From Swiss-Prot:
Annotated protein name in UniProt: Protein translocase subunit SecE
HAMAP family: SecE (MF_00422)
Keywords: Cell membrane, Membrane, Protein transport, Translocation, Transmembrane, Transmembrane helix, Transport
Subunit structure of this chain's protein: Component of the Sec protein translocase complex. Heterotrimer consisting of SecY (alpha), SecG (beta) and SecE (gamma) subunits. The heterotrimers can form oligomers, although 1 heterotrimer is thought to be able to translocate proteins. Interacts with the ribosome. May interact with SecDF, and other proteins may be involved.
Gene label: secE
UniProt topology in membrane: Single-pass membrane protein
GO CC terms of this entry: plasma membrane
Species in which this protein is naturally found: Haloferax mediterranei (strain ATCC 33500 / DSM 1411 / JCM 8866 / NBRC 14739 / NCIMB 2177 / R-4)
Function: Essential subunit of the Sec protein translocation channel SecYEG. Clamps together the 2 halves of SecY. May contact the channel plug during translocation.
Upper classification of the organism: Archaea, Methanobacteriati, Methanobacteriota, Stenosarchaea group, Halobacteria
Transmembrane segments: 33-53
Length: 57
């Protein structure tokens, strides 16, 4: 494990990284929000179905 090489790699990546534009940030936020909503909706649907089954929650 070459620590110096690893640190140089991390520094190189950080130098290439840039702040996203507002449009890019907005698009990523919308997609992430939609994903969170869908996962929550799926969990709610599973909970609702399990509540109606005999021996459910």
């Amino acid at each position: 494990m070459d620590v110096k090489y690893d640190l140089n790699s991390y520094v190189r990546v950080l130098k290439l990284a840039s702040t996203p534009s507002w449009q890019e940030f907005s698009q990523i936020s919308k997609i992430a929000g939609a994903g969170i909503f869908l996962v929550g909706l799926l969990g709610f649907i599973i909970f609702a179905v399990m509540s109606f089954l005999p021996g459910g929650v």
